[in-house]
């Protein structure tokens, strides 16, 4: 390490005790709502109700952080409080690096996280940079300041389970059960999603603290003492037709093979451990969590090897379930790739969830539309729920989702909601929310964003763009164009990341957030952004030859020069 890097290494802090929470109400800390919004959402990402490990700036997904270190966090906060409405803050891998004069319709923040030149886009190189304080893993919504807790993925998981039920069980999951693992920020959505879809679930998690958190937030119903107890509960509840979620503390690489040996037959098998990051996110079998964390620092290469070997056993068990005729699918954590790298040559014999169940939605620009109430008042969300029903009156499935979400989903941090809606609907809802702020029906502005897992904002050959019809799985021009268009359209902040969901070298993706502050200027920006953003998804899928997307483009009047109009 050079002398300069040695100084850099000593000059930053990853761990700091204390509680970060976003302000509530209408009193501003920043100069306007356009800068108050990213400030509150950054802080909300680190709220103890939201983040997995807030003292180390980790929001979710292994080491997905909101800022590179605490010094950078403090400077981001300072910069946002001082930022004028004709200036733009640039954030490079969680570090505020510049403030530039732009104009009032430009984004207030532009973020680039974890991006590496392709030849160097590996965990090994990233971890070297990370150790020197030169990079930060932003996951998808951690480093882009629009994570809303496990609710953010609940509906996508719910839609997946419902569609799997339609395809395999005549649309009825009553008396069925899902086997899965991982109860972190993303995987924690699975038990509740299964329950809402009408199924029981057995959810394996190696950290008791995560099980405790999911039970506290009502994402998990109960915990079993051991595998025998878990299977007995599953047998009882499925026989009774109840949809109950059960957590089991243990290692999936040990428990799934044991279930195969016993001849246990779930009705659906998937996984959402943090397998994308073998150094930080997947516990090798036979190890304790404390041992894993210590050895990841002292002997990272051996830790990665051990984690991948355990993943191989995990995937082999999933393959055995599939070969027994049980619907089995990857839920986007790249576990198949990790297993393949250590010799499981047929790891990709079971599909990813997007080509299996979700792509028809993406073809219509339908994806994870989310919003948060900057007031902190849950009533603002309930009023927007009602507005969604009013503006989309004939979608019974969506109405059921909103009713179930209100009944079952606990808000984490600032109250927020997610619902999957598409091109045309997003702009209508955004303009309506803005009018509700203008009229005073909502007590403060709201922000509208989305996951990077959306129809036009990601290139990820092992997840969102797996098995594209034209073979364009790895073409990453599309998320770059999405980020550029959202910037040109006037989103309040725009992000461009690498490695989210599936790890370094396997994805590029972009995000946007826009503020509804009740002004005419906001309405103009909302109309542009919330049309153009999902339209890029329709464009991307139409370009790949999907008839559903081509029809949608024609219906919505999109100008796609190479697509016959």
Curated annotation (Swiss-Prot):
The active site is at residue 419. It catalyses: 4-imidazolone-5-propanoate = trans-urocanate + H2O. One of its GO terms (cellular component) is cytoplasm. GO terms for molecular function: urocanate hydratase activity. Its EC number is 4.2.1.49. Residues 453-472 are annotated as: Disordered. It is found in: Cytoplasm. The keyword Lyase applies. Keywords: Cytoplasm, Histidine metabolism, Lyase, NAD. Binds 1 NAD(+) per subunit. GO terms for biological process: L-histidine catabolic process to glutamate and formamide; L-histidine catabolic process to glutamate and formate. It is an enzyme of class 4 (lyase). Pathway: Amino-acid degradation; L-histidine degradation into L-glutamate; N-formimidoyl-L-glutamate from L-histidine: step 2/3. Its cofactor is NAD(+). Residues 463-472 have a biased composition (Basic and acidic residues). Catalyzes the conversion of urocanate to 4-imidazolone-5-propionate. Belongs to the urocanase family. This is Urocanate hydratase. It comes from Pseudomonas syringae pv. syringae (strain B728a).
């Amino acid at each position: 390490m050079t002398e300069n890097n040695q100084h850099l290494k000593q000059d930053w802090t990853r761990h700091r005790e204390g509680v970060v929470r976003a302000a509530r109400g209408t009193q501003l800390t920043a100069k306007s709502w356009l800068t108050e919004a990213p400030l509150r959402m950054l802080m909300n990402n680190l709220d103890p109700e939201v983040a997995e490990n807030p003292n180390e700036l980790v929001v979710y997904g292994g080491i997905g952080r909101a800022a590179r270190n605490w010094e950078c966090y403090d400077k981001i906060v300072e910069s946002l409080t001082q930022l004028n409405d004709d200036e733009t803050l640039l954030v490079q891998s969680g570090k505020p690096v510049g403030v530039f004069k732009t104009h009032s319709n430009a984004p207030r923040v532009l973020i680039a996280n974890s991006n590496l030149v392709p030849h160097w886009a590996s965990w090994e190189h990233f971890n070297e940079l990370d150790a020197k304080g030169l990079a930060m893993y932003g996951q998808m919504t951690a480093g882009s300041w629009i994570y809303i807790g496990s609710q953010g993925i609940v509906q996508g998981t719910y839609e997946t389970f419902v569609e799997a039920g339609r395809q395999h069980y005549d649309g009825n999951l009553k008396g069925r059960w899902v086997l899965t693992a991982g109860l972190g920020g993303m995987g924690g959505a699975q038990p509740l999603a299964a329950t809402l879809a009408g199924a029981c679930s057995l959810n394996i998690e190696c950290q008791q603290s995560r099980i405790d958190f999911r039970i506290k937030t009502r994402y998990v119903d109960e915990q079993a003492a051991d595998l025998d107890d878990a299977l007995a509960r599953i047998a009882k509840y499925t026989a009774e037709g109840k949809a109950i979620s059960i957590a089991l503390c243990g290692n999936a690489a040990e428990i799934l093979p044991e279930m195969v040996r016993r001849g246990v037959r779930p009705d659906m098998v998937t996984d959402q451990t943090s397998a994308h990051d073998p150094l930080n996110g997947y516990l090798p079998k036979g190890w304790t969590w404390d041992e894993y964390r210590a050895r990841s620092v002292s002997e990272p290469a051996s830790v990665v090897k051990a984690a991948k070997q355990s993943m191989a056993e995990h995937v082999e068990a999933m393959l055995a379930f599939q070969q027994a005729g049980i619907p089995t699918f990857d839920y986007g954590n790249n576990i198949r790739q990790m297993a393949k790298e250590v010799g499981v040559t047929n790891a990709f014999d079971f599909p990813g969830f997007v080509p299996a169940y979700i792509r028809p939605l993406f073809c219509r620009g339908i994806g994870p539309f989310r919003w948060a109430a900057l007031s902190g008042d849950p009533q603002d969300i309930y009023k927007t729920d009602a507005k969604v029903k009013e503006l989309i009156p004939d979608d019974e499935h969506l109405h059921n989702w909103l009713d179930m979400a209100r009944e079952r989903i606990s808000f984490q941090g600032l109250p927020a909601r997610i619902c999957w809606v598409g091109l045309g609907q997003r702009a209508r809802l955004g303009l309506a929310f803005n009018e509700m702020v203008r009229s005073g029906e909502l007590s403060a502005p709201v922000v509208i964003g989305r996951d990077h897992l959306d129809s036009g904002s990601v290139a990820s050959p092992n997840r969102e763009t797996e098995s594209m019809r034209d073979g364009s799985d790895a073409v990453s021009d599309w998320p770059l164009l999405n980020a550029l268009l959202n910037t040109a359209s006037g989103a309040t902040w725009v992000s461009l990341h690498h490695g989210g969901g599936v790890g370094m070298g396997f994805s590029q993706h972009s995000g946007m957030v826009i503020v509804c502050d009740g002004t005419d200027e906001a309405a103009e920006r909302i109309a542009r952004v919330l049309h153009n953003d999902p339209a890029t998804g329709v464009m991307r899928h139409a370009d790949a030859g999907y008839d559903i997307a081509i029809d949608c483009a024609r219906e919505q009047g999109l100008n796609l020069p190479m697509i016959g109009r």
